[in-house]
């Protein structure tokens, strides 16, 4: 019934909780976020005399898989959904307005959830943590490290709205430092190496925002830019 839906399934009444975890892609940073969440929630629940069961699933970098996974959690009546990365959060938003959803590894919730008048609260069943770095501080640090550079390449995945948000925010900050900025956007992991090569050829310094695809392709990017 509706009273159960507001807090997930029926299991919570007995002090036993079912938690679905959807992670966009396997990556050391995302893996650590998932493990940290599991460890702390287990500690808190067991300290209160309860038990928690996790269903951890990885979408292998595919947004469509996130939707399939989250819909499975909803059908199973899970008590809580943890969405690791923006695409996972967006899938959870589309799948349920009743089961509580926690996000992590999400840069900007307003952008991710399509909230234009973002105030820091969703006003919905969704909450979570952000990994947004202080972009003004990053611009200052880049200037401190590379004071003689002229051209900054902004390398990011065009399919990730949070990455575009960061680029749009830091670009004017870098331009105010006197840099000429050029955007180099790749669509997915298939063209990251070629776009990174273009960025390396046309830039003195390359800036990469918090970007899931770039993070999962660190080796491919390094193989291009380090020799350059």
Annotate each PLM feature:
Residues 12-39, 44, 55-64, 159-163, ...:
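Extracytoplasmic "Venus flytrap"
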Residues 78-79, 149, 203-204:
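Short, high-confidence coil segments that cap the C-terminus of an alpha-helix
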């Amino acid at each position: 019934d509706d009273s159960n839906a507001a807090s997930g399934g029926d299991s919570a009444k007995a002090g036993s909780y079912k938690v679905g975890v959807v992670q966009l892609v396997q990556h050391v940073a995302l893996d650590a976020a998932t493990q940290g969440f599991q460890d702390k929630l287990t500690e808190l629940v067991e300290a209160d005399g309860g038990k928690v069961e996790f269903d951890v699933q990885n979408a292998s970098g595919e947004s469509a898989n996130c939707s399939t996974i989250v819909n499975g959690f909803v059908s199973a009546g899970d008590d809580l959904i943890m969405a690791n990365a923006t695409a996972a959060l967006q899938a959870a938003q589309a799948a349920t307005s009743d089961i509580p959803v926690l996000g992590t590894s999400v840069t900007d919730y307003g952008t991710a959830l399509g909230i234009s008048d973002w105030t820091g609260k969703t006003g919905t069943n969704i909450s979570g943590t952000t990994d947004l770095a202080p972009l003004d501080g990053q611009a200052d640090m880049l200037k401190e490290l590379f004071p003689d550079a002229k051209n900054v390449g902004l390398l990011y995945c065009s399919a990730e709205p949070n990455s575009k948000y960061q680029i749009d925010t830091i670009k004017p900050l870098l331009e105010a430092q006197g840099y000429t900025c050029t955007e180099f956007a790749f669509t997915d992991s298939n063209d990251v190496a070629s776009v990174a090569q273009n960025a390396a050829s046309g830039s003195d310094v390359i800036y990469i925002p918090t970007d899931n695809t770039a993070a999962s392709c660190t080796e491919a990017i390094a193989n291009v830019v380090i020799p350059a």
